[in-house]
Regions:
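A generic structural motif
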Residues: 29-33
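Beta-propeller fold recognition
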Residues: 1-6, 34-442
């Protein structure tokens, strides 16, 4: 309930702000809402109800403004620490750069305004230097985006120390629950050139940029009415050996509902994908009067096993549709120019609450080609699966070490002498991987 309707509040109906068309009254301590249209509610849960929510953020005293974490959700992700230029654009004096932590807003538990942000925090004092709001897309009849946004995933932080770029500070990439990838400028760059898709080169025209600038780089176009492609886990990043492009790799899956209970299974259409950032190592900018790129700008490599459908220079990237309501259950891992995805296949019927099956999908980083057959041969009931079967249950993040891949599994592994650990040989194709730098992960 809203305890004090004299204070600011926001009312949402099915993800749409209806505050201006709703009247709230408080009679004897009981708050009543009067809408301008009828909404459905079934207390038995036998039929679908409309989703009505009220958000009211508590007031902040003047003494606590520098520690304003009111919009922080459940912090599932890990902060990243680096040195940021304290004067922003044009600050070439690295001696007075400041240590900051980049923390995503966390899981908002589907509460509007909570967790859909990124905090830049003074590492020494804990004060909030900047709260960067990330858009929670409004519902429209085309995209049908009805997911309440937040950012449970860890950020991707790229410093010049971990790459061949020429700037101080970092370029930050965050992917949110509704599948947008946002690029944030925390460098000393003063301007950025534009990338020409026709020539594959940067133009001589430059656009001024400032510290804390951001724009949406990509959008997977998530909707519970169409595909149920939630993005809970972080991306991985690296330079493709053949393309020489900077890539971001991700996967979708509703880990809060692994077996898709009370969900139309025909509307569960998860994906694995790789996206190029054409502007790297510069910041780039949003397209004027255009929507962010989506999978329409990418090659569908779902059935490609020989590289014949490799993305061209002007394609944004590649994507693979995952069948049988499978879902990516942890962040992908790059090693040896191959990206590895931990995948879960839910059981159906009488065992719909069971463990499900675990697979590792291996994909060529540059082309999106399915390389899973190189991991081993599936036998018996798994012989027709396109990814490599490794046991029952949910996989952890896959770790590459030497020539091996390691992962924990919640059920039973196919490794006979290691019940809850998966150990298999990796595929070696060579990759420059930025996630292994101590400067980025410290």
């Amino acid at each position: 309930n809203i305890l004090d309707i004299s204070k600011d509040y926001t009312i949402f109906a099915n993800g749409i702000d209806v505050t201006s068309s709703t009247t709230a009254t408080n009679i004897s301590g009981e708050v009543k809402l009067i809408f301008n249209k009828e909404y459905r509610y079934d207390a038995t849960g036998n039929t679908s109800s409309d989703n009505i929510s009220i958000v009211q953020i508590g007031e902040l005293s003047s003494g606590g403004e520098e520690y304003d974490y009111r919009y922080l959700g459940e912090t599932w992700g890990s902060p990243r620490v680096f040195r940021m230029p304290n004067e922003g654009a044009g600050d070439n004096n690295v001696l007075d750069d400041e240590y900051v932590a980049i923390l995503t807003g966390g899981f908002g538990n589907f509460s509007h305004s909570i967790g859909s942000n990124v905090y830049v925090i003074d590492w020494l004092t804990g004060k909030v230097k900047k709260e960067i709001k990330i858009e929670d897309k409004a519902y429209d009849d085309n995209s049908k985006n009805d997911i309440i946004n937040s950012i449970p995933a860890s950020p991707i932080v790229i410093t010049a120390d971990s790459s061949q770029a020429n700037f101080s500070g970092a370029l930050v990439y965050v992917n949110d629950l509704e599948g947008k990838i946002t690029k944030i400028n925390l460098t000393n760059m003063e301007q950025t050139p534009e990338y020409d898709l026709l020539t594959g080169k940067f133009t001589t025209n430059a656009t001024p940029i400032n510290l804390y600038d951001k724009y949406t780089l990509f959008d997977v176009m998530a909707s519970t009415q169409i595909n149920n492609i939630y993005s809970y886990h972080s991306l991985d990043a690296g330079i493709g050996v053949r393309s020489k492009s900077f890539w971001l790799f991700g996967g979708t899956g509703d880990i809060m509902n692994l077996n898709d209970l009370q969900v139309d299974h025909n509307k569960v259409k998860n994906v694995m994908y790789g996206i190029k950032d054409f502007s790297y190592p510069f910041f780039g900018s949003a397209k004027t009067n255009q929507s962010p790129d989506n999978f329409l700008r990418c090659k569908n490599t779902t059935k490609d096993q020989d590289g014949s459908n490799c993305p061209d220079i002007g394609d944004r990237g590649w994507y693979i549709n995952i069948d049988d309501q499978k879902k990516v259950v942890n962040e992908p891992t790059l090693t040896g120019n191959v990206v590895y995805y931990p995948v879960f296949k839910p059981l159906r019927g009488s065992k719909s609450c069971g463990d499900g099956k675990a697979y590792i999908c291996s994909v060529d980083a540059d082309c999106g080609t399915n390389l899973s057959k190189k991991l081993g041969t599936n036998e018996g009931a798994e012989s027709n699966e396109e990814c490599y079967y490794v046991g029952s249950g949910v996989l952890s993040k896959i770790v590459g070490f030497g020539t091996k891949l390691y992962a924990n599994i919640s059920g039973e592994s196919t490794n006979k002498d290691k019940d809850d650990i998966v150990v298999i040989d990796a595929i070696d194709n060579g990759l420059i991987n930025y996630r292994t730098s101590w400067r980025e992960n410290y």
